[in-house]
Curated annotation (Swiss-Prot):
Domain of life of the native organism: Eukaryota
Cofactor list: [4Fe-4S] cluster
PROSITE patterns membership: 4FE4S_FER_1, 4FE4S_FER_2
Species annotation: Psathyrotes annua
Cofactor details (free text): Binds 2 [4Fe-4S] clusters per subunit.
Gene: ndhI
Role description: NDH shuttles electrons from NAD(P)H:plastoquinone, via FMN and iron-sulfur (Fe-S) centers, to quinones in the photosynthetic chain and possibly in a chloroplast respiratory chain. The immediate electron acceptor for the enzyme in this species is believed to be plastoquinone. Couples the redox reaction to proton translocation, and thus conserves the redox energy in a proton gradient.
Quaternary structure annotation from Swiss-Prot or TrEMBL: NDH is composed of at least 16 different subunits, 5 of which are encoded in the nucleus.
Full protein name: NAD(P)H-quinone oxidoreductase subunit I, chloroplastic
Lineage: Eukaryota, Viridiplantae, Streptophyta, Embryophyta, Tracheophyta
EC class (word): translocase
InterPro entries attached to this UniProt entry: 4Fe4S_Fe-S-bd, 4Fe4S_Fe_S_CS, NADH_quinone_OxRdtase_chainI, NDHI
Protein family per UniProt: Belongs to the complex I 23 kDa subunit family.
Predominant subcellular localization, coarse grouping: plastid
Protein's cellular compartments: Plastid, Chloroplast thylakoid membrane
C-alpha cells in the first residue's frame, strides 16, 4: 500500500486508543464523585478506628506473671520487666513494667503472644508530647483506661465505612 495510507491508518488507530484511555480515566473520575470526603477537621472531628486498630498498649498489672514473653517476641526488646523471685513460693513477683512509646513500632507481637492476656491494644493514638521522656509509660500509665472516641461528647465522630456495591 501507499505509505501515506498506512500512516493515516496508524494515526486513526492511535487516536481511537487515546480517546479510549481518556474515556477510561474520565469514568474513574466520575465514579469517585459520589464517595464521601476523606478530609476531617481533626481536633473537632475524629474517625472511629477499626476493631483491630493498634493504638496505645493497655497493661493489667494483676494478670502479669513476669514471664517476659513480651520482651522475647518484641523485635526491639522494648518492654522493661523488673521482677523479684519469691523463694518461699518459688514464683516471680512483678515489681515494675514499662514501655517507651517513643521507640515502640506498634507491631502487636507482645499483645498476641502474652499467655495471660494482660496486654491489649487500645484505640488511643494521640501520644504526641513536647518531651520524648514523657512517652516512657510505667505500669500506672499503661493501666489507665483510654476514653473511647464514641463516648467523648465534645468530639463529632465520623464512621468511615467502605462502600458496598450492589
Amino acid at each position: 500500500m501507499f505509505p501515506m495510507v498506512t500512516e493515516f491508518m496508524n494515526y486513526g488507530q492511535q487516536t481511537v486508543r487515546a480517546a479510549r484511555y481518556i474515556g477510561q480515566g474520565f469514568m474513574i473520575t466520575l465514579s469517585h464523585a459520589n464517595r464521601l470526603p476523606v478530609t476531617i477537621q481533626y481536633p473537632y472531628e475524629k474517625l472511629i478506628t477499626s476493631e483491630r486498630f493498634r493504638g496505645r498498649i493497655h497493661f493489667e498489672f494483676d494478670k502479669c506473671i513476669a514471664c517476659e514473653v513480651c520482651v522475647r517476641v518484641c523485635p526491639i526488646d522494648l518492654p522493661v520487666v523488673d521482677w523479684k523471685l519469691e523463694t518461699d513460693i518459688r514464683k516471680k513477683r512483678l515489681l515494675n513494667y514499662s514501655i517507651d512509646f517513643g521507640i515502640c513500632i506498634f507491631c502487636g507481637n507482645c499483645v498476641e503472644y502474652c499467655p495471660t492476656n494482660c496486654l491489649s491494644m487500645t484505640e488511643e493514638y494521640e501520644l504526641s508530647t513536647y518531651d520524648r521522656h514523657e512517652l516512657n509509660y510505667n505500669q500506672i500509665a499503661l493501666g489507665r483506661l483510654p476514653m473511647s472516641v464514641i463516648d467523648d461528647y465534645t468530639i463529632r465522630t465520623i464512621l468511615n465505612l467502605p462502600e458496598i456495591k450492589t
